[in-house]
């Protein structure tokens, strides 16, 4: 029989919210008897935006803003039906983007 696994990829702008959501998923999966690999921290994507400070003059005066996207990866190996049900019922924070892929 093939080993089935669930790959969960989480993204968020705030790393504290992301870590809390990751902790919830790991504890839920372990509580239902699944084997969890991770969380694996993936590289943080940094987008920088440079704008002029003044709308009229002084081209040399600029201001920079950045958006950091933090990412984590989880693998749940051999999930039980209870694991899948518990993960579906799990209520995560609003600022976390969750991608779930089922694989063999």
From Swiss-Prot:
SUPFAM superfamilies: Ribosomal protein S10. GO terms for cellular component: ribonucleoprotein complex; ribosome. Pfam families: Ribosomal_S10. One of its GO terms (biological process) is translation. Keywords: Ribonucleoprotein, Ribosomal protein. InterPro entries: Ribosomal_uS10, Ribosomal_uS10_CS, Ribosomal_uS10_dom, Ribosomal_uS10_dom_sf. GO terms for molecular function: structural constituent of ribosome; tRNA binding. NCBIfam families: PRK00596.1, rpsJ_bact. Belongs to the universal ribosomal protein uS10 family. Involved in the binding of tRNA to the ribosomes. Part of the 30S ribosomal subunit. This is Small ribosomal subunit protein uS10.
